[in-house]
Amino acid sequence: MEAVVKTNPYANQENGRMGVANVTFGEVFKARSMNIIKGKNDELFVSMPSYATRKVDENERPVFQDYCHPVTKEFREQLYGAILESFKTGQDVKIDTGTGKDTPDIEVTVVPIEGDNSTKALARICIDQGFVVNNISIKENKDGELFVSMPSIKTTLTDEQGNPEYRDVCYPTTKEFREQLNEKIIENYHLAKDIAMDVADDKAERTGKEAEKSADKEQKGKTSIRGKIKEGKEKAAVNVQQNLADKAKATQER
C-alpha cells in the first residue's frame, strides 16, 4: 500500500521546532502533527505527537505516550527518512508498506473500561503491521448509542464561547473508510466485553466451587470430630458398665 508524506516548515522556527509532517495511508487515513526538530549539531530528527499520562517517572515528572508511532524498525526508518527528505526538498515523498493493497490492513485491540462514565473502552489500531494509533475512545452518548472518538490535541484556537478547540491527530479521510473503521472498532468492543464477561463467569464459578469444597471439608472435619466424641462417650459408657459388673461379681464372691 502506498503512503504519502507531506511536510510544512514553521514560519517561526523557535526552540528547535523546524516544521510539521503528516502521512496519509492509502488515501483513506491520515496521521499528523509529527514535529521536525533540530537537535545537537543542527541534526534534524522526528518527534511523534504525544500526551502526558497519569504516570510519573522517578523524578516525579509526567510520563508521555505517543498518540501514534511506527512499531517496526524497518517502517520507522522508512517513515522518518521520508519525512526528513520531504522537509529538505519541499516535495511530497511516497513510501510503500509492502502489502500490495490499495487500502490499509487494520488490526484492532480494545480494552473495556468498567464504570458508569461515558468512555466505555480504549482502543488502538495497527496499520499494515507497522504503524500504531493509540488512545482511540469508544464512548456512549446520552441516548445509549456508541461512537468512536479519534485521539485529539488542544490547539491555540478558541470557539465562540472561548473554549479551546481540539483537532484530531489521526483520522479517516473518507466517509466510507470512517464507517468501516468505526464499525470494526465497535464490533471488537462487543467481542472484548463478551470475553471479559466469560472470564468473570469462569472466575465466579471457580470461586464458588472452591468455596463449596472448603465448606464440605469443614463439614467433614466437624463430622469427624463429632464421631470421635461419640466414639469416646460410647467407650466410656462401656467401661463404666464393665466396672459396675466387675464390682458386682466381686461382691458376690465375698
Explain the meaning of each model-derived region.
Residues 12-14, 26-28, 42, 57-60, ...:
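Polar/charged low-complexity regions in secreted precursors and cytosolic/nuclear IDRs
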Residues 1, 85-109, 117, 137, ...:
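Gram-negative host-targeted secretion-system effectors, predominantly Type III and Type IV
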Residues 35-85, 139-187, 191:
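Histidine-centered catalytic/metal-coordination loop motif
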Residues 1-40, 47-53, 85, 95, ...:
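Basic nucleic-acid-binding interfaces
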